[in-house]
Amino acid sequence: MGTPLFAVPILKSLYQNGYSVSVVYTQPPQKSQRGQKINKSPIQGISETLKIDYRTPSSLKNNKEEYNYLKELDADIAIVVAYGQIIPKEYLSLVKKGFINIHASLLPKWRGAAPIQRSII
């Protein structure tokens, strides 16, 4: 689960080192400010390049379809890198060995949309 460019090297490393990546969750494509062009997230782009299935739900909260999909996936582990959504508590028990959250800064002190920039200021 991830969205920005920061998450791309982690997904590439997992893929290149032979780990089985069943699915990638990322934010849905967003309209850019100029021209209102629809832009995919960097993670969606690399998932397409590597031919890894991906999903782009607008929310996981009260989302039975995604809950059931993840449940049926029967994954061993989930890695979250700057996903940009709160993962509902009920999802946490769906993955056998749990979730690993990779964050660009110390949590909870430097959380939010710009943790690296805030830690520098």
Language-model features: locations:
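One-carbon transfer enzymes
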Residues: 1-121
